[in-house]
Amino acid sequence: MTPDLLWAPFGEFAFMRRALLGGVALACSAGPLGVFLILRRMSLMGDAIAHGILPGAALAFWLFGLSLPALTAGGLVAGLGMAGAAAWVTRRTGLREDASLAALYPISLASGVLLLGLAGRKLDLLHLLFGSALAVDTATLYGMLGTALFSLAVLALSYRALALDSLDPLFLRSISRFGPLAHAAFLTLVVLNLVIGFQAIGALMVVGLMMLPAAAARFWSRRLLILLPLAALIGAVCVWLGLVLSFYASLPSGPCIVLLAGAFYLFSLVAGPVNGLLRSTPFPITV
């Protein structure tokens, strides 16, 4: 495939340019968040919250139709509510947070599907779960760009607190009272990116764009300051190539993007210089 073929769809079609800009913006903010989720051993939280936003989005659709602000607000409230409920259960019962999320997300998913059925209005459930990056309109694009800029700004301003909270939360709590605040801000960013992403590539596919580049980057560096931009870069390249593959092969865009990210993860798992299968010496992550 020549370089012209790789860029031609974006020069010719406005919807391809919107899909590329929105997807790259989402990759640049979701990838670093995925790195922190892996460091916190909360990798499945993204998947659980992605299911958890469905009832909020379904209720918003029932009440307001296909309104971007309503869907965003509904998904955000549902996602934050689910994360807060899981944290409350953990504090009150001692159950691990991932176990609490695993118990809550099937309830949320079933509630969302039931609400869509009760609404009696036509909305393709597959589109809600798997989305279409090629259907990104101008309003959604602005939402994705704004979310990415906000997320990156918060990550830059709170990097030290997030790094300490991920690598040694007890130490952070011993020297500062802002440990719970950093954790809450991080969860808010995760939910916000999942909510804005599900409108473009679906509630389930956005988890792949958040976690797979982060997991792949883990095999190429052990420094956190390198892992964060590397995950964003891997995600952005996968968005670009996935959209090109989707365009020429007439395939769904979301799965193409995620499968390319998965292929690079498998390659990194085998050939990565840090803890890859071809290496015998493990390396810890350092700040």
Question: Locations of the language-model features?
Answer:
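Short loop segments and helix-boundary regions at transmembrane helix junctions
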Residues: 35-50, 54-122, 217-229, 246-249, ...
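Cytosolic-side transmembrane-helix boundaries in multi-pass membrane proteins
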Residues: 251-287
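Transmembrane alpha-helical segments in multi-pass inner-membrane proteins
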Residues: 204-255
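Loop-to-transmembrane alpha-helix initiation sites
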Residues: 22, 68-77, 98-102, 145, ...
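Helix-loop-helix "hairpin" substructures at the membrane interface of multi-pass membrane proteins
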Residues: 140-213
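Small-residue-rich segments of transmembrane alpha-helices in multi-pass membrane proteins
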Residues: 51-60, 103-115, 135-136, 179-190, ...
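Membrane-interfacial amphipathic/re-entrant helices at transmembrane-helix boundaries
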Residues: 1-28
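Membrane-interface helix termini and inter-helical loops of multi-pass transporters
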Residues: 2-12, 122-136, 244-247
